[in-house]
Amino acid sequence: MDAITCIKTRRSIRKFKSDAVSAEDIKDIVLTASYAPSWKNTQTTRYIAITDPELKNRISKECCGEHNQEIIDNAPMLVATTIIDKRSGFERDGSYTTVREDNWQAFDNGIATQTFCLAAHEKGLGTVIMGMYDIDKAAEILEVPEGQLLMALIGVGYPDEQPDVPKKKTVEDLLKFR
């Protein structure tokens, strides 16, 4: 599928079939996501693929509200994205490179996460990015290494729904020429 079609047809999927997601597919998706641009090519995003039902259940029940619990319980795989802290947007001495301070880390992770989701869509997998959960508790459960920060949880699986295209803003609302 071409890039424009992939971008325009990807939807957030919240209902999944029970079919397992292969390790090879996830490896291919992460490889593709590694091509996402990042600050000075720091490539700070890391991925944790979670298929262990007990681990998924703990994250669902101990870290999430009801809506995200349903998604995680239904998804055959949960992927957590982390970043290596204090690299993206920082100088070697630890000072900020830009006025955005440490926010650049989230920007880079967002680019990598979107690229991950597009690569998954190209393989016929659905994804939904979740940001509302107890980050500290989830990081503890996942044993996120020291020096990394947990950023997002992504439900991954074969879609069991075909959501409509959500209403989009007009180009006139989004773009200004000066």
Where are these regions (language model features)?
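Short secondary-structure boundary segments
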Residues: I83, M132, Y158
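A structural motif
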Residues: I26-S34
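C-terminal helix-cap and adjacent tail motif
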Residues: A3-I13, S18, R87, R92, ...
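A glycine-rich helix N-cap at a beta->alpha junction
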Residues: N68-L78, E143-V165
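Glycine/small-residue-rich phosphate/adenosyl-binding loop
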Residues: N41-N109
